[in-house]
Amino acid sequence: MASRQQTRIQAYLEKNKIGPLFEELMTKLITETPDQPIPFLIDHLQSKQGNQGQLQRALSGSAALWAESESSEPKGTRRDFRSYDKPWQMNAKKPKKSKSDLAVSNISPPSPDSKSLPRSVDHLKWNWRTKPQSRDFDELNHILQESKKLGKALENLSRSIAISDELDKETLAFNSSLLRPRVIGEWIGRAENDADPLAAEMLQPPVPRSKNDSWESEDSSSSPAGSLKMEPKTKGLKQQQQQHKKLLAAMLSQDSFESIHSPTPSVIEEDIDNEDDAMELLENLDDLRMEGVTTLVLSGSKFNQGRPTHPAEPQAKVTLNICSRLQGDNLMERTEDTLQILHTPDEIIPDSLDSLPGTEETLMEEGEDFEKTSNLTEPGEASSGAHSLKSYMEEDESLKQLQVVHQPWLLPSDTESEGIEAEQDKRSADLLCVPCSSCPTLIYSGLSVKPAKEVASGP
């Protein structure tokens, strides 16, 4: 019985479209939200009564509602409930709610005292100048700023704590005896009203204390065994200029010739090193001794700025005599030139005897000049000339054989490389010499009159 009545009700509802009608009424109430819902529904039903012919369409669900709502409303207020946006329309409508949402709204109807918003609110245009209602980005920015402030506050707090700790440590260290300022030596012989005390201290070094002092014996193991010799920065410009002039005068006073041949370095270099601190590269033994260091290592004492004292190795060189017109007729000037020539260790003969015109005559003239100058030389130099003559006589036979073949030949030297270098020096010297009528040819050091005559008389 109940099932028959239920089927009859279901058929009635489906026949008269009661379900879609109520769905349409609910959607109109939800979308329009009028102040007086009952008169609004009555007006809507009266408008539906005049168009009953369209309700007979074979449409189902929400499609019938859309068709009925479009036909019932005037064209000015036509509304579309499709769920996608239409950017080409200025007033995009809200998407249509599903049936589940409508069922929920049927269960909990709106309260009668709820007021509906004016319809102009629904048709407001979007304005890009107005701020959005959502504050998400502003809140995020605010959170970031607050975190930065907190980070800065924490950093300042930690810095202040660290500074306070350092101040505490400094006060403890100042009160302690370990980091107490100390004076290593006593200054002797300096006036109290000295204008430049630092310069006086540099000139008069301190006298080292004895090792039985209590505070020095405690820290002698931990103190560094080196000292830096610092030039006072308060020196004026005039003092620096005077010191520079002294340094230049000391450098010019050194004899360069003697510094090359002498085995011992000059004494002035130590004064230069003491005056100029830029030359001081390694430890100063006086400073170490003044600090109380007993075991001094001489290997790292001080860098010597002097020239190297290597033994003078013989080098094959060719010297050119100056023209007699430029040199003058004074015989003493010529003897000085020949004495300087005699200092050169090795000698070289030109490449070929035939390459120079009048070689025999020029060699005879050189022999005569050597006879004149050898009378003015000292006995030590004469003995050195005799020694070179003896060494030359031993090699005379081989030289004569080379002269016959007219090959370029060299006088004996220590190594072949020295002969090659001497030959190159000779050729460059020949290019520099300007021959004239009164200019003597090459003078070879170490030769006297007899070997010159023998070379001239050779084949």
Swiss-Prot record:
Which spans does this entry mark as compositional bias, Basic and acidic residues?
72-85
Region annotated Disordered, chain positions: 66-119, 204-246, 364-385
Q: Which residues form a coiled coil?
A: none
Task: Name its species.
Answer: Mus musculus
- Protein name listed in UniProt: Uncharacterized protein C8orf34 homolog
Record's Gene3D superfamilies? Answer: cAMP-dependent protein kinase regulatory subunit, dimerization-anchoring domain
Q: Which cysteines are joined by disulfide bonds?
A: none
